[in-house]
């Protein structure tokens, strides 16, 4: 059952809780970790972990693909308006809580080239990496690690105990050590770099 404000349960404290849980989720599509970096700074208070979105939006150029359950739709409408419509349908509208900075909703990537949908920009940059202009997941749950209060909060707009069981059932996925697949090489000449 969906709730207006999320149900919250507290998990045992561990400073590395974000990495601990994310290591079990990182293999899932749309899993994300926003990490504070453990810095002693007011803006480094929280780590946020999400995965398993209820909906995703991906924009390349003029097309946005919205994927919800088994349904995929493509639109050329303004991607930010499409995102707002999807958020409205998800009906995730929690009240402000300074101890829970993210209580579900949209999390993702807004690339510089998304600006081309709203204003004319010069076409001087080389597209040297293939990334969407926008890639956003809509999440109805999150894990929030608060490094000031030393709390780990699992919140969900649906059954929080079912989400906890799901989270705890995720298995660690061993990762291979990083290795180069080819020699290092520059993407520009020394002269180009100096310009």
Task: Label the predicted regions.
Residues 1-31, 36-75, 112-195:
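Extended accessory regions or peripheral subdomains of proteins
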Residues 58-116:
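Glycine-rich, N-terminal phosphate-binding loop and its surrounding beta-alpha-beta segment
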């Amino acid at each position: 059952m969906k709730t207006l404000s999320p149900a919250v349960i507290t998990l045992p404290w561990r400073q590395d809780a974000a990495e601990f849980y994310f290591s079990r989720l990182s293999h899932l599509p749309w899993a994300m970790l926003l990490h504070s970096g453990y810095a002693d700074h007011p803006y480094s208070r929280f780590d946020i972990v999400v995965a398993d979105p209820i909906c995703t939006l991906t924009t390349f150029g003029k097309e946005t693909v919205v994927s919800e359950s088994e349904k995929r739709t493509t639109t050329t409408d303004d991607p930010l308006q499409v995102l707002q419509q999807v958020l409205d349908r998800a009906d995730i509208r929690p009240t402000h809580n300074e101890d829970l900075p993210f209580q579900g909703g949209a999390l993702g990537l807004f690339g510089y080239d998304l600006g081309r949908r709203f204003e004319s920009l010069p076409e001087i940059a080389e597209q040297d990496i293939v990334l969407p202009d926008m890639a956003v997941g809509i999440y109805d749950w999150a894990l929030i690690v608060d490094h000031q209060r030393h709390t780990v909060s699992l919140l969900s707009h649906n059954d929080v105990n079912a989400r906890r069981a799901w989270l705890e059932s995720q298995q660690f996925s061993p990762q291979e050590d990083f290795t180069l697949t080819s020699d290092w090489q520059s993407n520009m000449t020394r002269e180009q770099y100096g310009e």
